[in-house]
Amino acid sequence: EEDLKKGLKEVGLAEGRVFNKSLLDRVEQELRQQYFGRGYYAVSIQPTVTPLERNRVDININIEEGASAKIKQINIVGAKEFSEKDLLSQFELTTPGWITWYTKNDQYSRQKLSADLEKLKSFYMNRGFLEFAVDSTQVSISPDKRDVYITINLNEGARYQVSSVKLAGDFTISEEELAKLVVVKPGDVFSREKLNESNK
């Protein structure tokens, strides 16, 4: 509640300020989006404005969060080289299981989904798929706003191998010694992780 009051004050809704109805409407929409982003699709936000004496108003924002929506299904479309099970094992988000009552990883969050998509990209980039891309993600909610269905459409692209490794620059130690430190070798499947190790 204190964080909410602080946020309202920052946007101009605070005691002593001139009341602006359009600003209150914008705050309501932003609050709704914040709750949606955390998986609370059943949230109810009811602002009420009560006129007081001496041209003042009393603003009350009643929020009922409701239950957070649970992930019912995650589908990955376009994967050919890896199984959906292997790809979903990279994700923090998951469907309800015996431990999710504790981890809450079955509760949809826009931020968590973005982080999981980054993990998916790293998974592919470390296995030679330089052109990997997530073409689209669809998040749909059941009519009762309790279940979330996620569909991820991806394009794996081609798998690349390292054809050659060349060292360039002025070296204080021999090129042979430096070559021993290079993790990436010709013929290896390209890996962004290995390339970063070699750069250290």
Report each predicted region and the residues it spans:
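Interaction-mediating elements
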Residues: 1-200
